[in-house]
A protein has these predicted regions:
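Blade/loop signatures of beta-propeller domains
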Residues: 3-24
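A short beta-strand motif characteristic of beta-propeller blades
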Residues: 26-32, 68-74, 110-116, 156-167, ...
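Beta-rich, blade/repeat-based domains predominating
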Residues: 34-46, 76-91, 118-133, 164-184, ...
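Residue position within the beta-strands of beta-propeller blades
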Residues: 50-53, 92-95, 134-136, 186-188, ...
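Beta-propeller domains
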Residues: 50-74
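Structural signal for beta-propeller blades
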Residues: 57-60, 99-103, 141-144, 193-195, ...
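Short loop/turn segments that connect beta-strands within beta-propeller blades
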Residues: 63-67, 105-110, 147-151, 199-203, ...
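Blade-level signature of beta-propeller repeat domains, shared across WD40, Kelch, NHL, RCC1
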Residues: 269-306
Length: 306
């Protein structure tokens, strides 16, 4: 039973089946800004891009008017923390001083407060419509959650056995996560080279991408997953250095389609994470090229993005 309904801030653009993106990306954060490790990113409904500059202990933002701002300096950040922002502009990520401790920053402040303490590092974070905070514990092989509505809320195991494995109720290093409007959970099960789907209340998953599904799709250590408005999957296929779109019973490559890593503008070198703005433009954390790339939705595909 749904007791609360919160407005979420992530974008799920409506995309045509024949949508394509410009082959050449634009660097929005380079190495001097993002540091050596380009990992956690998030674009909110105001089209503000948030990025974790872990090496600089900073959180970066890029506003729609192209203004860059450093939100917080001298922040202790966990190496692989995800990042999520709620409707009030509060930023959630993992503090680097203590495993599993999630902190939030109120909008326009440098002050943080602890909101959760999970039993392992959170490589992926997500907030659903019920204002529940999810954590994918890569090293514990489980996904857990807790309500942000009640300070006394307990941590609940969503799925995973806390043991590395390839069963449909197991993970081998879960990474990026996404929860849709029906509270269906999608998990990038990196070590098993697949994307797993879990219906509400179920701890037995279904493989919906990877290991031959669909149409012989082979993923290699996927670490990011998001959905568009029609529940089509977009996957950061990390070690194949590409972004994949799964639509119906087939898949398409969006970026890095020859799977050869490079530093040219049309390539990625370890596609770590991705996020959309409201226009359908795609942002990718290009980890080993030490940059965040923007790939614009082509004007001859699904209308005229701004």
């Amino acid at each position: 039973m749904v007791l609360f309904s919160y407005i979420v801030t992530y974008n799920r653009p409506k995309l045509c089946p024949n949508a394509i993106w410009d082959a050449d990306g634009t660097t929005v954060f380079n190495q001097s800004l993002i540091g050596y490790h380009a990992r956690g990113i998030f674009v909110d409904s105001n089209n503000t891009l948030y990025a974790v500059a872990q090496d600089h202990s900073e959180i970066l933002t890029l506003f729609q008017n192209s203004t860059i701002q450093v939100l917080s300096k001298r922040v202790q950040l966990a190496n692989y923390t995800g990042i999520i922002v709620n409707i009030d502009g509060e930023i959630y990520l993992e503090n680097g001083t203590e495993s599993g401790r999630i902190v939030k920053w109120a909008k326009n402040t440098n002050n943080s407060m602890s909101v959760a303490h999970f039993p392992g590092h959170c490589y992926g974070l997500f907030i659903d419509h019920n204002n529940s905070l999810y954590c994918s514990m890569n090293e514990k092989d489980a996904v857990v959650k807790m309500s942000l509505n009640d300070k006394t809320s307990k941590i609940v195991n969503v799925t995973g056995t806390y043991t590395d494995g390839s069963g449909q109720n197991q993970f081998s290093g879960p990474w990026g996560i996404f929860v849709d409007n029906n509270f269906t959970l999608y998990v990038a099960d990196s070590g098993n080279n697949r994307i797993q789907c879990f219906q509400l209340g179920e701890n037995i998953g279904t493989t919906i991408a990877g290991n031959g599904t669909p149409n012989n799709l082979q993923l290699k250590y996927p670490t990011g997953v998001v959905l568009d408005a029609d529940n089509n999957l977009f996957i950061a296929d990390k070690n194949n250095s590409r972004i994949i779109r799964v639509i119906r019973d087939d898949y398409q490559c969006v970026v890095g389609c020859d799977s050869n890593s490079s530093s040219t503008s049309d390539k990625l070198n370890n596609a770590y994470a991705l996020s959309f703005d409201s226009h359908g433009n795609l942002f990718a954390a290009d980890e080993y090229n030490h940059r965040i790339q923007k790939f614009t939705l082509a004007t001859n595909s699904c209308g005229n993005p701004n």
